[in-house]
Each structure stands twice: as C-alpha cells, then as structure tokens.
C-alpha cells in the first residue's frame, strides 16, 4: 500500500514539475519576514487616513443626528405661550437640535473606525502592531507633565500630532528640551 507522499513522489518522477510548485508555494507562505510589512511611513499615512475618516464620519453623523431630531421636532405640536422647563419653546427646540448634533458628532469615531477597518482590512493587523509599538515609544519617551508652566508647555503628551518620522524626531527633541528646561528651573 502506498502512502500519500510516496504517491506524490512516484507521480513527480513521471512529471518532475509537480513537486517544484508545491515547494515554492510553501516557501512563500511560511517565510519568516512578510514581503509587504508596514513601514513607518505607511503607518503614519494610514494613521492620517484613519483620523480623516473619523473626522468626516463625525461631521456626517452630526448632520444625521440633527436631521433626525429636526424631523421629530418639526412634527411636534408646541404651544408658544407655554414654557418648557421654564424656557421658551424655541430655546428648548434649538437646544435639542444642538444636543442631538453633538451626540451624533461624538458617535462619529465609532462609525469611522468601522469604516477604516472595512477599507483597510488587509493591512489592519500590521497597522495595529505598529500602533502598539508607536504608543510604547510615546509612553516611554514622553515627559513628566507635573512641571509644566506657561513658559514651558508639555510637547504633545499623547503624541496625537505626530504624522511622520520627521515629526516624531522633532517631538523627541522637544521632549528632551522640555525635560532640560524643567530640570534647570527646579
């Protein structure tokens, strides 16, 4: 009785091109370093895209929230002579519209992150790994904010404004300058 591997070897003797594609396939899938690893430049571009998607979705959900509340409030019967919570009805309606728009704006990043995950799903695992590594660098290199003052403000404590490798290096220089100033003046 022949095993599967012996059958493949015997067939490959008859057709020598059969084993070679299998080896190439396996080598590609089991290589140590992936061919399309995410560089820091690509990471910062994806980070900027995620931020833009989140802001855009915040504006969109704010408009949707305000329109939905307007659709509800425009059909309500309100007596203009009666006060609502001690306020004029027009003030209450306006506050309701603004509150629903603000709530929609706050819901935007939740929608935007899902859109980002759907559009960049193939790079998402690498992006998350780079993001964790980047945040570790930020936490490790950020300064102690307890000695800040008007003349010596803290340089971007959470690293939110860092958009490139050049800006990251500038942020590091700013952190070192802040620490030096804080040490000298204490």
From Swiss-Prot:
Membrane topology: Multi-pass membrane protein
Principal place of residence: mitochondrion
Parts of the chain that traverse the membrane: 53-73, 83-103
GO terms classed as biological process: protein import into mitochondrial matrix
Transit peptide: 1-30
Keyword terms: Membrane, Mitochondrion, Mitochondrion inner membrane, Protein transport, Transit peptide, Translocation, Transmembrane, Transmembrane helix, Transport
InterPro entries assigned to the protein according to its UniProt record, in alphabetical order: Pam17
CC terms in the record's Gene Ontology section: PAM complex, Tim23 associated import motor
Domain of life assignment: Eukaryota
Similarity section: Belongs to the PAM17 family.
Description of how the protein assembles with itself and partners: Component of the PAM complex, at least composed of mtHsp70 (SSC1), MGE1, TIM44, PAM16, PAM17 and PAM18.
Chain's role: Component of the PAM complex, a complex required for the translocation of transit peptide-containing proteins from the inner membrane into the mitochondrial matrix in an ATP-dependent manner.
Protein name: Presequence translocated-associated motor subunit PAM17, mitochondrial
Protein species of origin: Candida glabrata (strain ATCC 2001 / BCRC 20586 / JCM 3761 / NBRC 0622 / NRRL Y-65 / CBS 138) (Yeast)
Gene transcribed to yield this protein: PAM17
């Amino acid at each position: 009785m022949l095993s599967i591997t012996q059958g493949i070897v015997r067939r490959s003797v008859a057709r020598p091109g059969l084993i070679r594609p299998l080896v190439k396939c396996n080598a590609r899938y089991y290589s140590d370093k992936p061919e399309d690893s995410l560089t820091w430049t690509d990471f910062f571009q994806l980070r900027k895209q995620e931020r833009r998607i989140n802001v855009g979705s915040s504006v969109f959900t704010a408009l949707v929230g305000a329109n939905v509340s307007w659709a509800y409030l425009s059909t309500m019967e309100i007596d203009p002579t009666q006060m609502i919570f001690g306020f004029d009805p027009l003030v209450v309606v306006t506050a309701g519209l603004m509150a629903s728009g603000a709530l929609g704006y706050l819901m935007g990043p939740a929608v935007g992150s899902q859109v980002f995950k759907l559009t960049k799903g193939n790079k998402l695992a690498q992006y998350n790994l780079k993001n964790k590594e980047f945040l570790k660098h930020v936490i490790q290199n950020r300064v102690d904010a307890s000695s800040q003052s008007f003349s010596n403000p803290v340089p971007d404590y959470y690293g939110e404004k860092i958009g490139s490798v050049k800006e990251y290096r500038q942020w590091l220089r700013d952190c070192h300058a802040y620490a030096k100033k804080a040490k000298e003046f204490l």
